[in-house]
């Protein structure tokens, strides 16, 4: 598979990756940005940098509503950028304002995976505050179902189950080239 940089169509201002935690947004985002010659922006990393503490710490100290407000500020900030691949947090699309800003900012690509695949990918991670006490398939399935209507709003959806990062990036770049 070719690993060279490709040119995104001029109509593509940004590429926004949405999806549940563990669907590959960060891994795909970094490689996609490299391939497109775009910058990579991770919303959660921007929040951590701005607050000076981890997302787990933000949740513990201030709760989810405070985190979501910070997330909306980060979405506002990146929505003004150009030539970025943006990885959102899994819950960023819950907010109607965020969804609107993201759609206006670029091509929204939703990454999906089966509940089993997400559980496998998240098994060893400890930085997921909404799953801190419950990493069961039932909890993950319920959260995915709650968010499905928001994820379905994307321009392109890709199931990452059983696929390599390179394969997912190739699907996205193929879509962008044909757009």
From Swiss-Prot:
For the keyword Nucleotide-binding, the answer is yes
MF term (GO), any: magnesium ion binding
Per UniProt, subcellular location reads as: Cytoplasm
Q: PROSITE patterns of this UniProt entry?
A: SHIKIMATE_KINASE
Any one Gene Ontology BP term: chorismate biosynthetic process
Listed binding positions for ATP are 22-27, 128
Q: Which residues does the record give as substrate binding sites?
A: 44, 68, 90, 147
What reaction gets catalysed by this protein? Answer: shikimate + ATP = 3-phosphoshikimate + ADP + H(+)
E.C. no: 2.7.1.71
Identify the cofactor(s).
Answer: Mg(2+)
User: Single GO cellular component annotation?
Assistant: cytosol
Entry's cofactor comment = Binds 1 Mg(2+) ion per subunit.
Domain of life of the organism in this record? Bacteria
Q: Which CDD domains match?
A: SK
Q: What is its main location?
A: cytoplasm
The pathway where this protein functions is: Metabolic intermediate biosynthesis; chorismate biosynthesis; chorismate from D-erythrose 4-phosphate and phosphoenolpyruvate: step 5/7
Q: What residues bind Mg(2+), as annotated?
A: 26
Keywords attached to this Swiss-Prot or TrEMBL record, sorted alphabetically, are: Amino-acid biosynthesis, Aromatic amino acid biosynthesis, ATP-binding, Cytoplasm, Kinase, Magnesium, Metal-binding, Nucleotide-binding, Transferase
| Reported function | Catalyzes the specific phosphorylation of the 3-hydroxyl group of shikimic acid using ATP as a cosubstrate.
* Family listed: Belongs to the shikimate kinase family.
Subunit record text: Monomer.
Report what the protein is called.
Answer: Shikimate kinase
Per the UniProt record, the source organism is Geobacter metallireducens (strain ATCC 53774 / DSM 7210 / GS-15)
Taxon lineage: Bacteria, Pseudomonadati, Thermodesulfobacteriota, Desulfuromonadia, Geobacterales
Encoded by which gene? aroK
């Amino acid at each position: 598979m070719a690993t060279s940089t490709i040119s995104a169509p001029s109509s593509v201002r940004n590429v926004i990756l949405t999806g549940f935690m563990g669907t590959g947004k960060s891994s795909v985002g970094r490689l996609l940005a490299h391939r497109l010659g775009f910058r990579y922006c991770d919303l959660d990393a921007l929040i951590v940098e701005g607050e000076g503490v981890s997302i787990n710490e933000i949740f513990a100290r201030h709760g989810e509503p405070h985190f979501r407000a910070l997330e909306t500020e980060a979405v506002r900030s990146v929505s003004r950028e150009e030539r970025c691949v943006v990885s959102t947090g899994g819950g960023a699309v819950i907010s109607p304002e965020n969804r609107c800003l993201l759609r206006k900012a670029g091509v929204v690509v939703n990454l999906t995976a089966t509940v089993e695949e997400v559980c496998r990918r998240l098994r060893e991670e400890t930085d997921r505050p909404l799953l801190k006490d419950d990493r069961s398939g039932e909890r993950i399935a319920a959260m995915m179902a709650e968010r499905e209507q928001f994820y379905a709003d994307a321009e392109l959806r890709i199931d990452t189950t059983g696929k390599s990062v390179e394969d997912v990036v190739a699907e996205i770049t193929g879509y962008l080239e044909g757009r």
